[in-house]
Amino acid sequence: MFNRAVSRLSRKRPPSDIHDSDGSSSSSHQTPKSTAKWASSLENLLEDPEGVKRFREFLKKEFSEENVLFWLACEDFKKTQDKKQMQEKAKEIYMTFLSSKASSQVNVEGQSRLNEKILEEPHPLMFQKLQDQIFNLMKYDSYSRFLKSDLFLKHKRTEEEDEESPDAQTAAKRASRIYNT
């Protein structure tokens, strides 16, 4: 269940089609580059499925992927309405990230850890304090390193090259029409 939720949250959404008045696609009217959006805030990065994917790749190399996985699981948990599902997800989050035997234990302050008994009566914000701790850990530690990482910079360069490419193709098309080649 947890893996499905993370997969769903980090799945890439299809880009919007942006067209000129003549119906042709135009790169000059597109939204800001994803890397610029990611660099503006951790919140923006976490709202973008491709950003989450790249951030996870980076965190995996740093052996701290559990932080973003925990954050995503908490986001999914907050959206859960069914009481039974909420109870199952709460236990899964606890067993995966918070218990002393957790397979992907996150680093939260000892007094912030939840008592297993609270899992019997879950509520949407029960993990909020812990999620905020992990968010701040990522924001002030991993995120700044991610923005300087080869992985991010390579993606940024690729994005810039792709942005230049359509203009060059458009110029070539115009030249071929002018010179009938």
UniProtKB/Swiss-Prot annotation:
GO terms of molecular function: G-protein alpha-subunit binding; GTPase activator activity
Residue ranges of domain RGS in the record: 41-156
Compartment(s) of residence: Cytoplasm, Cytosol; Nucleus
PTM annotation (Phosphoserine): residues: 24, 41, 176
Gene3D superfamilies membership: 1.10.196.10, Regulator of G-protein Signalling 4, domain 2
Protein role: Regulates G protein-coupled receptor signaling cascades, including signaling downstream of the muscarinic acetylcholine receptor CHRM2. Inhibits signal transduction by increasing the GTPase activity of G protein alpha subunits, thereby driving them into their inactive GDP-bound form. Modulates the activity of potassium channels that are activated in response to CHRM2 signaling. Activity on GNAZ is inhibited by palmitoylation of the G-protein.
Subunit description: Interacts with GNAZ, GNAI1 and GNAI3. Associates specifically with the activated, GTP-bound forms of GNAZ and GNAI3.
PANTHER family recorded: REGULATOR OF G-PROTEIN SIGNALING LOCO (PTHR45945:SF3)
Protein name per its UniProtKB record: Regulator of G-protein signaling 10
